[in-house]
């Protein structure tokens, strides 16, 4: 049986497209990056202490059921452990030097180790990223390439007091053919986004944008095909947080949704973050000893379903999940309306109507997913009849 229903297709209206935001505009079809959010916090669904040998865990990568991390001072080992327990293996990167390894990232072939910590004096001239093949790591015969960079807007004229520079960095993500780094600005608690190629060589890191974080960024990871970046960090009072960037256009990482989420693990110096699907993330904190407390290094599981599922798997201006049901999905983009459906709809006619019921467009569904240019549609509201197979 075919049951007809209606779906409103909006004209090209800019605004906040996230239903979870304070200022969500259901009529908006273009995300203009203005979404604001209520204060929110999450608690780890699971936390396990790490071995003492990884007291200064700094970066984190998830690869299947394995987590990879490293320390940030002198130690040249990569450490692999299961996300289910703390049994670990060490893989030394022979011939390398760890000045301040602060984060790691990966693509299909390589691990990338960011030796770019710069908080002690703010005047390093040897910022670099080491690139090593994953297969070489597992074979124990590691050789590495070097990617060197300098910030385009930094003029080095001497040293600064520790933890005062705006050119420290502890976070990076490999996205496409680029490395994206996020600075740790100690004075303003903002973060500048820089990019440069991921191929070995020497580069000037180009400044793309600045994020008003209100905290110190210490780790990053990305799911490029979902337009999603997760950042982690902490406040000066050691209140850890996540900072989510998502639904941004192209490589304009600052131009989409920006949401800060507190982590209910106070005084944990969170340093690394990783995810494989955006719904379950993982972070690590290094050992912290103060006069009034001692925090062990740990690995935390973070369920982000309530924060990101609607975006990742459906919803306005969101990325639809793979359609295996008898339903037609509609997604509005800047210049097109994307229509996708079950293969059983091939050969089915469709039509788009305005609110007066006039047929504006009609045709036949010839492919499982196709786009309709909106340039010939005047701004306004339209009705699109879709059917469900019952």
Predicted regions and their residues:
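Bacterial Sec-dependent N-terminal signal peptides
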Residues: 1-15, 39, 318-319, 358, ...
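Primarily marks secretory-pathway-exposed extracellular/lumenal segments that are disulfide-
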Residues: 7-38
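Disulfide-stabilized cysteine-rich extracellular repeat microdomains
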Residues: 21, 26-29, 33, 225, ...
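Short, polar loop/linker segments at the starts of domains and inter-domain junctions
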Residues: 23-31, 160-167, 340
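Sequence/structural signature of beta-propeller domains
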Residues: 38-316
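C-terminal outer-membrane/trafficking sorting elements
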Residues: 320-390
């Amino acid at each position: 049986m075919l049951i007809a229903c209606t779906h409103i297709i909006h004209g090209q209206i800019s605004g906040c497209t996230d239903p979870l935001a304070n200022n969500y505009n259901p009529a908006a079809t273009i995300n203009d990056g203005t979404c604001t959010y209520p204060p929110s916090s999450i608690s780890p669904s699971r936390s396990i202490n790490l071995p003492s040998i990884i007291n200064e865990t700094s970066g984190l990568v998830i690869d299947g059921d394995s987590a990879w991390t490293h320390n940030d001072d002198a130690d040249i080992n990569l450490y692999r452990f299961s996300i289910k327990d703390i049994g670990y293996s060490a893989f030394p990167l022979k011939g390398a030097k760890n000045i301040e390894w602060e984060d790691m990232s990966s693509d299909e072939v390589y691990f990338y180790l960011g030796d770019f910590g710069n908080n002690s004096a703010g005047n390093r001239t040897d910022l670099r990223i080491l690139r090593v093949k994953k297969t070489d790591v597992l074979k124990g015969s590691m050789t590495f390439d070097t990617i060197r960079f300098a910030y385009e807007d930094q003029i080095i004229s001497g040293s600064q007091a520790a933890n005062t520079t705006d050119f420290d960095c502890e976070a990076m993500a490999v996205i496409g053919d680029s490395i994206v780094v996020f600075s740790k600005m100690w004075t303003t608690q903002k973060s500048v986004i820089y990019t440069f190629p991921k191929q070995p060589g020497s580069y000037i890191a180009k400044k793309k944008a600045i994020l008003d974080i209100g905290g110190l960024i210490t780790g990053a990871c990305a799911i490029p095909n979902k337009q999603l970046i997760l950042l982690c960090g902490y406040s000066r009072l050691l209140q850890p947080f996540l900072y989510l960037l998502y639904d941004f256009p192209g490589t304009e990482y600052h131009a989409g949704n920006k949401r800060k989420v507190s982590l209910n693990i106070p005084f944990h110096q969170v340093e690394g973050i990783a995810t494989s699907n955006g719904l379950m993330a993982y972070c690590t904190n290094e050992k912290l000893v103060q006069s009034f407390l001692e925090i062990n290094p740990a690995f935390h599981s973070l369920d982000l379903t309530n924060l990101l599922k609607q975006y990742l798997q459906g919803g306005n201006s969101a990325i639809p999940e793979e359609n295996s049901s008898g339903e037609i999905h509609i997604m509005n983009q800047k210049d097109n309306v994307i229509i996708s459906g079950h293969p059983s709809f091939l050969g089915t006619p469709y039509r788009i109507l305005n609110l007066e019921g006039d047929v504006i467009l009609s045709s036949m569904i010839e492919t499982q997913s196709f786009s309709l240019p909106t340039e010939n549609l005047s701004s306004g509201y339209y009705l699109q009849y879709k059917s469900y197979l019952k």
